């Protein structure tokens, strides 16, 4: 189920303040955030947002196709290293 239309999209207040400040100053520096649940809005297009994946911040450049998705979708939290082969070998 999606979020109710009357509530609107979720975006962290601190992230919104940083974006508005950068848009007023025409600044495009990297914004660091821990808010993976924030929805990408049209005002974010062209910005680079460093999203925390639990270990480090992953820079994500926002494009038009990303609008409506969550920031956390573009910063994977798990790394798959592959299945370990059996060390004993065949009998």
Curated annotation (Swiss-Prot):
Keyword GTP-binding in record: no
GO biological process, one term: ribosomal small subunit assembly
Pfam families reported for this sequence: Ribosomal_S19
Keywords: Ribonucleoprotein, Ribosomal protein, RNA-binding, rRNA-binding
PROSITE patterns assigned to the protein according to its UniProt record, in alphabetical order: RIBOSOMAL_S19
GO cellular component: cytoplasm; small ribosomal subunit
InterPro entries the UniProt entry points to: Ribosomal_uS19, Ribosomal_uS19_bac-type, Ribosomal_uS19_CS, Ribosomal_uS19_SF
Gene Ontology molecular function terms on file: rRNA binding; structural constituent of ribosome
NCBIfam families: rpsS_bact (TIGR01050)
Function description: Protein S19 forms a complex with S13 that binds strongly to the 16S ribosomal RNA.
Family: Belongs to the universal ribosomal protein uS19 family.
Protein name in UniProt: Small ribosomal subunit protein uS19
Organism: Synechococcus sp. (strain CC9902)
Biological classification of the source: Bacteria, Bacillati, Cyanobacteriota, Cyanophyceae, Synechococcales
């Amino acid at each position: 189920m999606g979020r109710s239309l009357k509530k609107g999209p979720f975006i962290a207040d601190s992230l919104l303040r940083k974006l508005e400040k950068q848009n007023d100053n025409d600044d495009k520096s990297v914004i660091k955030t821990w808010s993976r649940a924030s929805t990408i809005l049209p005002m974010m297009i062209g910005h680079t947002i460093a999203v925390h994946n639990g270990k480090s911040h992953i820079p994500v450049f926002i494009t038009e196709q990303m609008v409506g998705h969550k920031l956390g979708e573009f910063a994977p939290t798990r790394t798959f290293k592959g299945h370990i082969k059996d060390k004993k070998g065949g009998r």
